[in-house]
Regions:
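Structural motif
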Residues: 85, 132-134, 188
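Metallocofactor- and cofactor-centric catalytic cores in central/energy metabolism, strongly enriched
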Residues: 1-130, 144, 148, 152-157, ...
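Phosphate/pyrophosphate-binding betaalpha-module
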Residues: 136, 140-203
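Active-site-adjacent beta-strand anchor residues
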Residues: 115, 136, 218-219
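A conserved active-site cap/scaffold subdomain adjacent to cofactor or substrate pockets
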Residues: 165, 183-252
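Secondary-structure boundary elements
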Residues: 127-131, 153-160, 181-184, 213, ...
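Flexible, glycine/charged-enriched surface loops at secondary-structure junctions
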Residues: 27-30, 161-162, 238-248, 274, ...
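Internal helical hairpin/lid segments
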Residues: 226-317
């Protein structure tokens, strides 16, 4: 298939769904990791094409959703300083911190600017030498190379007024954490294709070896996801556990080597806290010592914060595939995209937002 329309072809999608029905002889619980995949499933009703025995649960692959509450609070604290320009991706502005969000901080007079590329933050620093420019650098492996390039560029130019508040997370350690959890029900994973375009597929081999669980790297269109489900069902029904790549048009086994090189130049692997989940060993990236001059935590001596999620929010269970958004008593009533209790309701990749926009069964409106 060469053209996008083919990956949305109803005839092909229904044929794949039919084969899934024919091959499924027992119940299976499958998890799509990426929030973009979740939105495709909800938008096109793909789960409703599957047999009752196939349950799709949603994973922690929404970068905005897993950015720690403490990081949001730190960003707000920095933004409210009169000498600081806080630069962020737009998705982060309405993510609730413990008391406020960046959009409210902006309304209070904070200089918060939206960027579509990390290099825009470097440009802002270059153009405002009398201000301290902090870039909120979040995301999975997908955005890490571009964020690393921003730090590399700032160092090359000798910019002394640029820094980054980093909250980068890695997918394979998150899958490992899910697998060792006593509450885990997942029997097969659809790995996020966009992440794998950067890092390739090789990092998933250890998971298959250690847990004997099938993993299929999948794309983001309806046909991609149904084909990935079919590939998982084939493996599970045959008692196999191997790594397969459905997203061959974009993902290679080795990934993007130059992107990996700039990541390795700027970042190193570290333990990382995930919002609603807790700390996962070796699941994040932090700036290397050679780039510590661009670490906002050090520059502003931010220290460590400890804050709790709203008691009513079940986003932690949603991000681990333990509950669906509609299981939340606040869903669609006390928690909406306009007034979110948790990040999954406000992010464009959040599972709660996907359910709110495409499927609000049983919710009073």
């Amino acid at each position: 298939m060469k053209y996008l329309d083919e990956y949305r072809d109803q005839r092909i999608a229904r044929a794949l769904a039919s084969e899934i029905v024919q091959r499924t002889t027992r119940p299976w619980v499958l998890m799509e990791i990426c929030g973009g995949q979740t939105h495709t499933i909800m938008r096109y009703g793909l789960d409703e094409l599957l047999p009752r025995g196939i349950e799709l649960v949603h994973g922690p692959g929404c970068p905005v959703c897993v950015t720690p509450l403490e990081t949001v609070d730190k960003a707000i604290e920095l933004a409210l300083r009169p000498d600081v320009i806080l630069v962020s991706y737009g998705d982060m502005l309405r993510v609730p911190g413990s008391r406020s969000d960046l959009l409210r901080a902006k309304a209070q007079g904070a200089d918060v600017r939206i960027a579509y590329s990390p290099t825009e933050a470097v440009k802002i620093a270059r153009s405002n030498p009398d201000r301290k420019v902090v870039f909120l650098a979040i995301g999975f492996e997908t955005t890490a190379p571009a964020n690393a390039m921003a730090a590399w560029q700032a160092k090359r130019e000798g910019l002394t007024n640029f820094s980054m508040l980093v909250s980068h997370v890695l997918v394979p350690p998150a899958i490992r954490a899910l697998m060792v959890s006593q509450t885990n029900r997942v029997q097969g994973f659809i790995a996020p294709g966009h992440v794998c375009t950067v890092v390739g597929c090789k990092d998933y081999e250890g998971l298959i070896r250690d847990f004997r669980i099938p993993i299929v790297v999948g794309g983001f269109e309806p046909v991609d996801i149904l084909e990935a489900v079919l590939m998982l069902v084939r493996q599970l029904e045959a008692g196999e556990a191997k790594l397969e790549n459905q997203y061959v048009r974009s993902v290679s086994y080795q990934g993007n080597l130059p992107a990996q090189q700039i990541m390795a130049e700027v970042f190193e692997v570290a333990d990382q806290k995930w919002r609603g989940i807790g700390s996962i060993p070796q699941s994040g990236l932090r700036l290397r010592e050679d780039y510590s001059a661009y670490d906002a935590n050090r520059i502003f001596d931010l220290g460590e914060l400890t804050v709790d999620e709203p008691a009513e929010c079940i986003s932690a269970q949603v991000l681990q595939g333990l509950k669906k958004p509609t299981d939340c008593p606040a869903f669609g009533m006390r928690c909406t995209p306009e007034n979110p209790l948790g990040a999954p309701m406000v992010s464009t990749e959040g599972a709660c937002a996907a359910y709110y926009h495409y499927r609000r069964h049983g919710v009073a409106t």
